[in-house]
């Protein structure tokens, strides 16, 4: 068995649903601030910033249909909660 075959067998599929499920189960919660939003054909994208151990992280997320029911919660300047990966602080989702 060659080296290529070993790595080929460890193929990982990392879908958005799996990422969200992982963060909902294992992610730590912190506060974030919405800094901007943008309407696109796919939906509303919000941009947010949060700080972990003094380091600022900026991210964006396409709002779900459920989140779109409360647009003021995601208006620029609003405080929201995010879950982040304790091993990769840049990986986060809005809660």
Task: Indicate where each model-derived feature is located.
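Oxidizing extracytosolic/periplasmic lumen-facing domains
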Residues: 2-95
